[in-house]
From Swiss-Prot:
CDD domains: IGPD. It comes from Acidovorax ebreus (strain TPSY). The gene is hisB. This is Imidazoleglycerol-phosphate dehydratase. It is found in: Cytoplasm. The lineage of its organism: Bacteria, Pseudomonadati, Pseudomonadota, Betaproteobacteria, Burkholderiales. It is an enzyme of class 4 (lyase). InterPro entries: IGPD_sf (IPR038494), ImidazoleglycerolP_deHydtase (IPR000807), ImidazoleglycerP_deHydtase_CS (IPR020565), Ribosomal_Su5_D2-typ_SF (IPR020568). Its EC number is 4.2.1.19.
Length: 210
């Protein structure tokens, strides 16, 4: 068996990892802007306060600059808004990541908050798959339907093209459960998207593509 050299002979310049995606349906109008190499700055307007708080965790703990503006049919409920933000954010990530050359690809994180503990593992595999277990102790948090956590991550996974395992391992307070999930997700993203200086310009797969 023969293998090509892992690292190219000359270093490749790091491409700009930003994206802007707009999505309009009869239910929502959304614009998302991301900078994967940011500082954690966020401007978030979904109309759902607790959801904005969770999205802020992605920005802050992932060191991702994130701007989301959403006008959704909240007079019905938050389902379309939360799901469609996940879809649009996933599309923006896919565009910003590009061909995945030089990234570490895999990331994981454990995050505690008082009694709650969550683990998230992500693989930028190009194969969408969500495996989620969060035994929420309440049906809503500040008007946010906890069932929509699944809808957000399913939308993201399908359009970012990632495999995502989410497990809330412990928790009594539903706010703490949800917050540890989003913080761990952010930290896992940050690890997976970090550029590996020893594999600059190389796609992290023996197949040569992802």
């Amino acid at each position: 068996m023969t293998s090509s050299a892992l690292v190219p002979s000359s270093a490749e310049l790091c491409p700009d990892r930003t994206a802007e995606v707009s999505r309009t349906t009869a239910e929502t109008r959304i614009t998302v802007r991301v900078n994967l190499d940011g500082t954690g700055a966020a401007s978030l307007h979904t109309g759902i306060g607790f959801f904005d708080h969770m999205l802020d965790q992605i920005a802050r703990h992932g060191l991702i600059d994130l701007q989301i503006d959403c006008d959704g049919d909240l007079h019905i409920d938050g389902h379309h808004t939360v799901e469609d933000v996940g879809i649009t954010l996933g599309q923006a990530f896919a565009r910003a990541v590009g061909d995945k050359k030089g990234i570490r690809r895999y990331g994981h994180a454990y995050v505690p908050l008082d009694e709650a503990l969550s683990r998230v593992v992500v693989d930028f595999s190009g194969r969408p798959g969500l495996h989620l277990h969060i035994p929420f102790t309440a049906g809503s948090i500040g008007g946010f339907d906890t069932q929509l956590t699944y809808e957000f991550f399913q939308g993201f996974v399908n359009h970012a093209g990632v495999t995502l395992h989410i497990d809330n391992l412990k928790g009594i307070n539903a706010h703490h459960q949800c917050e540890t999930v989003f913080k761990a997700f952010a930290r896992a993203l940050r690890a997976a998207l970090e550029r590996d200086p020893r594999a600059a310009g190389v796609i992290p797969s023996t197949k040569g593509s992802l």
